[in-house]
């Protein structure tokens, strides 16, 4: 068999150089904001993941002792475990990572079964400054690799939760409504409203919920449509986060989507997704997950995000943006008796940051000299 299974890919030298450069730039931004890099294991006990992920989406296997293990589908869950068991102490704690994750999803353009995420986690704070910082770091990371024409859609999990609480819906109805909102399927929502006998202000608000996306004016519109104390608190929080981002000069990147619901069920507060113009899927997702560490025994607030490196590559390729610095390539051709001198010269040039290949004259006959910027002959 010479073919690959669905959902994985090879990265050839130039592609991999491109990918590594993106990872390096993301990592550099994270570190400059005070985040320390961490690397959890590639696989753990399946139970550590199955509490949040459907087992059908995990790559699971047995070890020789009969334990059920799984390749990590997510790094945030691992960091929650690590902080709860090994990093108790002073907070806030700032951690970052660049790591491959594995999910048994249906492969499609921009969605693989093995992919690389670059992300950060800010643990131990639960105020608007930390949520604003997370969004700001995501924006700075995308800017650092040269991605243009992107927007960060910001929502709030509590917004949806408080709407369904007010409507007194059952779990099955909540899941159905969540699916309709994910699809922005307004006709299905209208049908849902009629079937459930929802009337008046609640019906009007619910029918407009998938349309509540755009600029700062969306928050004002939401208050006008359905002004309750609980929803008012949620909107006020979003307004405070937005004011901080305006102080950072980032308002041009921010939009709001109050009908946003996320697939990962560990989010508890603010959520966001980054979209690039012309690409129909998010390249970055994040939000607050104050309940996740409690699964591992420590009730500590936290927020973070993950950027898809492969989707960032696709965005840059679509925008025809090249971020690879061209290295100066040198070919040294030498006589056999000058091999020592040739190697010393090559070492000197490599110390200057140049790429150097050296071949004896006999071997150099088979080398494509056009691929080099400089050729040095060492004949005497």
Curated annotation (Swiss-Prot):
HAMAP family: HisZ (MF_00125). This function is generally fulfilled by the C-terminal part of HisG, which is missing in some bacteria such as this one. This is ATP phosphoribosyltransferase regulatory subunit. Heteromultimer composed of HisG and HisZ subunits. Keywords: Amino-acid biosynthesis, Cytoplasm, Histidine biosynthesis. GO terms for molecular function: catalytic activity, acting on a protein; histidine-tRNA ligase activity; transferase activity. InterPro entries: aa-tRNA-synth_II, aa-tRNA-synth_II/BPL/LPL, HisRS-like_core, HisRS/HisZ, HisZ. It comes from Thermoanaerobacter pseudethanolicus (strain ATCC 33223 / 39E) (Clostridium thermohydrosulfuricum). It comes from the Bacteria. CDD domains: HisRS-like_core (cd00773). The gene is hisZ. It is found in: Cytoplasm.
